[in-house]
Amino acid sequence: VDFLERLMALNSSGPVRTQRPTLETALKGGSAPVLPDPAPHTVLGTPVTGPWKPGQEHIVLGLGCFWGAEKLFWQLDGVESTSVGYAGGYTPNPTYREVCTGRTGHAEVVDVVWDPAVISLETILRVAMENHDPTQGDRQGNDVGAQYRSVIYPVGTPEQVAEQTAVARDVVSSYAERLKAAGYGDVTTEIIPLAETPAGEYYLAEDEHQQYLDKNPDGYCPVHATGVTCG
């Protein structure tokens, strides 16, 4: 996002839509993952890329800066693992620097793994929606760019994807009504199965971004909650 585009976004009262790349204009990316051998989760001690235990599911969520978002989820009972990465765009194996150019199409996201016997997807999605402003488009507070957009990318078997999509639509629709009653605009959250996004994949971010606020307790990454609850 260039200076002028960011300035205009910060002075906008409605949802922001920044310029996004196409398949032809997106950065070409790399041939290898930026984190090929991730370490175990620094808080939970679990693998961040599986294999998952029988019955566990995962979903990819974007709600602005992924540092603070990841911490929200690893603190929940029933969440078995989290990691941060990039999804929703075109560029394969992108770096953080590339994503920040706005030329990959990716959002900063968290891959959340949970045990449905302990915590429901509805609860996880309520936490996600209540802890950012999903009416801002390509922006969260002073963070401007498509990488900060609100997204929900269901993952798994066809049955799991269908169920996750249905739950996500219900939670977002209900929350949109509560936001509107509180004076907010339309919700801009994308709900798309991960496999149907342009690249169709979730790419792990670099090691320094994984569990960032555990490694850097004084790190800065505010949550842009509206104060409106899901009820």
Give the ranges of each region predicted by the language model.
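Flexible coil/turn and secondary-structure edge motifs
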Residues: 1-231
